[in-house]
């Protein structure tokens, strides 16, 4: 008999994360986690991050924090710099919201947490599993967008 697996897939789309946070908050509040695999695309990776930590506090504040103008500069298109300062945003966000990384490690034990990333050259989807100490680069890669296609 073949074992069936259940996946929770959270899409990206910037502010659609507000809706996704509402769903995952309800799952947390009801201790609902029948999932074997967690797959996040773009902002969905960040939403799953907080779901797997089991953090429901301040999710609106997290979305507003990420939308602040401090981290976004369209003029950087012309200077060759990053349009969105993801590294700085995550660094500042970790100080402000203090995520418990041990919780996420415990909650994915024996399960898969996957980030979907678009290859910048070929525009193909690539799938990256998370392991110890690999959170930041994979989250940032999933969140970054190619501007010109």
Model-identified regions with their sequence ranges:
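Patatin-like phospholipase
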Residues: 1-41, 49-149
């Amino acid at each position: 008999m073949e074992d069936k697996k259940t996946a929770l897939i959270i899409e990206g789309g910037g502010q659609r994360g507000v809706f996704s946070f509402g769903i995952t908050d309800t799952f947390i509040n009801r201790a609902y986690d029948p999932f074997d695999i967690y797959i996040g695309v773009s902002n969905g990776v960040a939403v799953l991050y907080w779901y797997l930590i089991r953090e429901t506090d301040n999710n609106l504040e997290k979305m507003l924090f990420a939308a602040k103008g401090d981290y976004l500069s369209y003029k950087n298109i012309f200077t060759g710099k990053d349009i969105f300062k993801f590294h700085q945003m995550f660094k500042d966000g970790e100080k402000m919201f203090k995520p418990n990384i041990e919780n996420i490690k415990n909650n994915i034990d024996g399960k898969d947490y996957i980030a979907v990333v678009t290859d910048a050259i070929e525009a193909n989807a690539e799938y990256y599993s998370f392991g110890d100490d690999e959170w930041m680069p994979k989250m940032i890669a999933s969140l970054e967008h190619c501007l010109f296609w």
